[in-house]
Amino acid sequence: MQLNNRDLKSIIDNEALAYAMYTVENRAIPNMIDGFKPVQRFVIARALDLARGNKDKFHKLASIAGGVADLGYHHGENSAQDAGALMANTWNNNFPLLDGQGNFGSRTVQKAAASRYIFARVSKNFYNVYKDTEYAPVHQDKEHIPPAFYLPIIPTVLLNGVSGIATGYATYILPHSVSSVKKAVLQALQGKKVTKPKVEFPEFRGEVVEIDGQYEIRGTYKFTSRTQMHITEIPYKYDRETYVSKILDPLENKGFITWDDACGEHGFGFKVKFRKEYSLSDNEEERHAKIMKDFGLIERRSQNITVINEKGKLQVYDNVVDLIKDFVEVRKTYVQKRIDNKIKETESAFRLAFAKAHFIKKVISGEIVVQGKTRKELTEELSKIDMYSSYVDKLVGMNIFHMTSDEAKKLAEEAKAKKEENEYWKTTDVVTEYTKDLEEIK
């Protein structure tokens, strides 16, 4: 075996750099167009395959995750199971793209049941927002069956929140309300000033306040007496177990409080009784500040908007408005592809229906004789007629029993409808069609 003499710098500049960029572009960072990390895209692709023929049927999450390898995902089904469980829950998503059936966790207890016991299917949310799938770009890796990215009409990367860490880069995008993102996309489409979308956490009843580019996520409480209060919401980073172990138990162990659990199906709840060792000011503002601090009711988060762009390259944004503007410009090109394709489709459908209707009339009138001729003879005859030459196989393949006046009339009406549809697509534009897409989002 021949050994190559290489220094450390060469290895770092080549293999290490290649691996670092692989983790950035193919594992940890979401795509700005469809909002998916690769594993999520594979899960959706597998769920879409299973939905063919019956969109309503639920499938075991283990079955969905187990099939991603056949689509070109080679990093193990455990990560696909975890991704699927997160995509289907409602407590962590403003806009779930999978419907879940079974125990997918909650804000109080976040862990989902084992994937063999829970079921999922593609959500109506996906079908309502992801359009033009037939025009989605093919992935450069031939073994990668899903497209390079799907084509939602709003930047779904902003809806549910996403985080990821790769070599040298990290992303942390907060969840935003669907309605505010939709509004911002429409403003960008119309060339208006774009309003920053509202940060909104799913199933959170507290308050989210922006302060100097950061966001404070504030829990809530209310005093039920001078020495007792009821905590009704806690910051989003906590589940029940973590909040109890990090906040309530230490305060109780210090002799400051006693507490009772009042969590239930409607969310968090903790009944707190202050002991005399815990002093509270008579000043309302000071008392509130102490409660918020001591009971961990303030969480601070900031955004780090690092994504993969439509060219498959890393891109960092200073704010979500710039991302939305770029998203709209990219997405408009695919709406134009839809329009161009519809023009061709309807033109072809019109000409075929018209040719069939005309052909039937000629057969009925006796100007074209079908009976007694071989397929080859009829093909040669029709090929010489310009109107029929592009559709010879379809005309020759028509059932002779369907060549009636009623069928000719029906085809003429179909041709008229396709002609009108063709005229519509010729006169519409990207802004009109994109606006219609947005209006369909409820």
UniProtKB/Swiss-Prot annotation:
Cofactor requirements of the protein: Mg(2+)
Boundaries of every Topo IIA-type catalytic domain copy: 29-438
A GO molecular function held by the record: ATP binding
UniProt-listed Gene3D superfamilies: 3.30.1360.40, Topoisomerase II, domain 5, Topoisomerase, domain 3
Keyword annotations of the record: ATP-binding, DNA-binding, Isomerase, Nucleotide-binding, Topoisomerase
PROSITE patterns noted in UniProt: TOPO_IIA
One GO cellular component, as annotated: protein-containing complex
A biological process from GO: DNA topological change
Residues annotated as catalytic: Y117 (o-(5'-phospho-dna)-tyrosine intermediate)
Membrane-spanning ranges: none
Function: Medium subunit of the DNA topoisomerase that untwists superhelical DNA. Controls topological states of double-stranded DNA by transient breakage and subsequent rejoining of DNA strands.
Family: Belongs to the type II topoisomerase family.
The name this protein goes by in its record: DNA topoisomerase medium subunit
Record organism: Enterobacteria phage T4
